[in-house]
Structure formats: structure tokens, C-alpha cells
Amino acid sequence: MLWKNQEPDIKILKDYEIINDIGFKAGVHSLQSNDKVTLVMTKNCWKQMMNHIEPHKVEMGGLVVGKVYKRKTPDEFICLFLKAIPAIDKDSSPVSLLMGTEVWNHANKNSLENEVVVGWFHSHPNLGAFFSGTDRMNQQANFSSQFHIGIVIDHIRDEYAVFYGKDSIQIDNKNVIVIEE
């Protein structure tokens, strides 16, 4: 057998590279966090999620495309949410969401260089922003890398919560930074 080195599918960038992607002021702000995980999200990505979720009283969701930046240690990172990819092929109710596989194809087609699926979003209309047991199983099965982030939004109660990694560890909302493009 011949061993051949191959670049990984997902490129983890160095933390200072975020300045090139989001500008000096926002980049420095994101680098100043002392917490393990910081989520930086463009206003446009937030709007894309909300435009998909708000008209509905059933669970809606999709994938998020962005970039990942490594910090000091392997379990410290900054995740940049750039684009929300709504799941159009889905089956949903007020308390459940089953996304079809087409959303993955759509996400891959809409990813630029160094952009990958970094997580997912979904709504809990008027149920509160929390990760249910099903959400935790989905995170562990489909978004198990340390940098994968799940965001749940209750647009009726105006709440959101953010979780990362296979163990669905909650990120304090103070570590979520929304930026202009």
C-alpha cells in the first residue's frame, strides 16, 4: 500500500486570518474573547435564517456555511457564519423537523474557497430556545466535529441558544457577535 498525503476537506484557518475576512475592528473584537468558542455571524446570515423561520409556526431550519479559525489550543476556535442555506426539502411540524438531503447539495454549491458547512439552525416556535434530546442526537450524529455549531431560535419568544461539538455544549450568548458585512 502506498501512503499519500492529502489535504483535509475542511481547512481550519489561523485565528488572525479572520481579520482578512471580516475587517480589522470586528476581527480584533472576535480575537479578544477569553472563552474557548466564539461565534461570529454576519447580519446577512442572521437575516437569511430569520426570513426562512419567521413566516412559519412549525419548525424550520437548514445548514450554515462559513469558516473556522483555530485559536491557541485545538479545542479553542472562532466560527464564522456567512450563509444560511434553508432546507426546502423537509417535513416539519410544530415540534419536529426532518431535513432532506438536498440541503447538503445546495450548501456545497454555495460554498466558496475555504467555506464549509460549519453547522445548522432550526426553530422552536413558542417552545423556547433549547436543544432537545433529538437535537442533541442530531448534533452528535451529523455535526460532531468540535467546531460544528447548532443554533436554535424561538422567533415568537425572541430567544436563541447556541451549542457546539458532539456533546452540544452551550455557548454563552455574550460570545455571539453579529457583524455588518
Task: Go through the PLM ranges and name each one.
Residues 1-117, 126-181:
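Conserved beta-strand-loop surface patch within small alpha/beta domains used
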